[in-house]
């Protein structure tokens, strides 16, 4: 087994700690799990058809980055409070150069946007990584010097899934700020935060997996949602079987907007059953999918939903090529595939919608790969797998929408 040892040094620096009033630290509110009762409450208060934004819920540790006006030092917080600089928290110190760059850039852009100085700027996010059990990925053991002592960088989560990277990373999902020391924190609306995040080179942030009315978001199957993170942190060519995501964080699109007066919950967790923290059985029996009925009704209403393509493919050139690939799934190509098959498989009732969709998807991929650039053909394995899934999905949707007409046209008695 390969092992690498890396050491980073950080000098202990004095910290001006927060006073007893806790005016700097902003505890990140716990998010309620979704269930049928809470979804029905959204319907009852008229928020069900509002726009909602779902991002991947990363399995890690809550982590905040604080920039305070007049202080040169950046502060870092876990869920329970701001940490002294010598506290060992999974080895986050190794990320400090990047974290400082992120918060400095966000502060500059936000102050420019607000056209005023801000007392505190805060990026909320998740610290994650430290485990990736793939035979082609070397096991790593890194240490970082904290207060003159070597401390081992440890995995934030040790479950068999989801696994993201052998290294430690930060995933940003919120921006908050205080104009004055005595003021309250203001949360940026999701789209405003994303506008700033995407302008910071190297910053990993919560992109929308799916957005729209809750009827559309709830049709997304979190039970079969493969994490989108590994390709973003260099693991795209090292797929893991069953690397399911923890779930989604679903926010109201107007959360943080001035004047927004919600009548119901504005943030919910849609968690994979494997990550439910309680059982509905008093005897702690098998976990159940509390969203099963809601998801079934939503699928009947909005259809099965896949992640937005932009959350899977983030390179602009690859994204454009991916959209072109999906444009190959069209009615004219379906007619061409049918002409190659003939009528006999339909006469003998041997052809099913899934079989026809598979033939269509294969034809799409064959033609696309024949004409596309080598750089697109050689995209990471995980992204290739995702794109194949999208092609099959779109092929099935097209075939199913025309199946009755296809059966009619493939009948030997059909005439124009």
UniProtKB/Swiss-Prot annotation:
Q: Name the EC number(s).
A: 6.5.1.3
Provide the reaction this enzyme catalyses.
ATP + (ribonucleotide)n-3'-hydroxyl + 5'-phospho-(ribonucleotide)m = (ribonucleotide)n+m + AMP + diphosphate
Q: Which GO terms describe its biological process?
A: mRNA modification
Q: Give UniProt keywords alphabetically.
A: ATP-binding, Ligase, Mitochondrion, Nucleotide-binding, RNA-binding, Transit peptide
A GO molecular-function term, please?
RNA ligase (ATP) activity
**Do you know which InterPro entries this protein is assigned to?**
RNA_lig_RNL2, RNA_ligase_dom_REL/Rnl2, Rnl1/2_C_sf, Rnl2_C
Q: Which GO terms describe its cellular component?
A: kinetoplast; mitochondrial mRNA editing complex; mitochondrion; mRNA editing complex
Entry annotated with the keyword Ligase: yes
Task: Describe the function of this protein.
Answer: RNA editing in kinetoplastid mitochondria inserts and deletes uridylates at multiple sites in pre-mRNAs as directed by guide RNAs.
* Name of the protein in its database record: RNA-editing ligase 2, mitochondrial
